[in-house]
């Protein structure tokens, strides 16, 4: 039996990604999805949230493919090239997990890739760089430092102070853009 859950609502994360995608894509847009694994519940939830929000908000948007990359940048690179070669009018890529560097590398060698909007999860050095270079439009974060802090704090309060935590301690979905990490000129 678990004490509580500290983390992000991944379904909400997928819906957030879709909501952003709906705002930036043209009418009748086409999106390719790269999912870490269809067997991991967090990625299943992100995908379901994304699909549901797209169908509710922008039924004109078509999801043209869902491919697994097992968080590997090499597979994300290959999948991105496949999407772009098969669908020269691809408008967006949503990646639910790791491997964003592979998407960035593939888009570097594709003509007209500046017309492809990309949304990913997790703020890493790689995803921040891709934000700064405007390859990625949005990165959704889950505040890993805050999650770790809340885990220790909750455990301490439970063990030392005998305070029973809420069953769910939700970590909000954060949204980062290129402006979030722009270096200021002196």
Regions found by a protein language model. Name each.
Residues 1, 24, 44, 48, ...:
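Non-catalytic structural scaffold of enzyme domains
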Residues 3, 91, 137:
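Conserved acidic residues
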Residues 3-4, 30-39:
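Short beta-strand segments enriched in small/hydrophobic residues
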Residues 6-29, 76-77, 127, 143-160:
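Hydrophobic alpha-helical segments within soluble ligand-binding/sensing domains
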Residues 13-17, 41-60, 75, 79, ...:
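Short, solvent-exposed amphipathic alpha-helices that sit
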Residues 34, 94-95, 176:
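Short hydrophobic segments within beta-strands
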Residues 50, 68-126:
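Hydrophobic alpha-helical
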Residues 143-186:
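Hinge/cleft segment of the Venus flytrap/periplasmic-binding protein
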């Amino acid at each position: 039996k678990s004490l509580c859950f500290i983390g992000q609502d991944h379904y909400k994360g997928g819906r957030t990604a879709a909501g952003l995608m709906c705002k930036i894509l043209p009418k009748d847009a086409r999106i390719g999805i790269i999912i870490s694994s269809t067997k991991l519940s967090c990625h299943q939830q992100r995908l379901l949230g994304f699909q549901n929000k797209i169908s509710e908000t922008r039924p004109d948007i078509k999801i043209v493919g869902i491919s697994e990359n097992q968080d590997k940048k090499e597979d994300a690179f290959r999948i991105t090239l496949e999407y772009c070669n098969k669908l020269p009018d691809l408008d967006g890529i949503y990646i639910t997990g790791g491997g964003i560097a592979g998407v960035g590398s593939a888009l570097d060698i594709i003509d007209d890739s500046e017309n492809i909007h990309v949304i990913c999860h997790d703020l890493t050095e790689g995803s921040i760089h891709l934000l700064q270079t405007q390859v990625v439009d949005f990165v959704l974060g889950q505040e890993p430092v805050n999650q770790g802090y809340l885990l220790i704090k909750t455990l301490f309060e439970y063990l030392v102070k005998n305070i029973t935590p809420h069953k769910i301690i939700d970590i909000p979905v954060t949204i980062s853009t290129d402006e979030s990490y722009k270096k200021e000129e002196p």
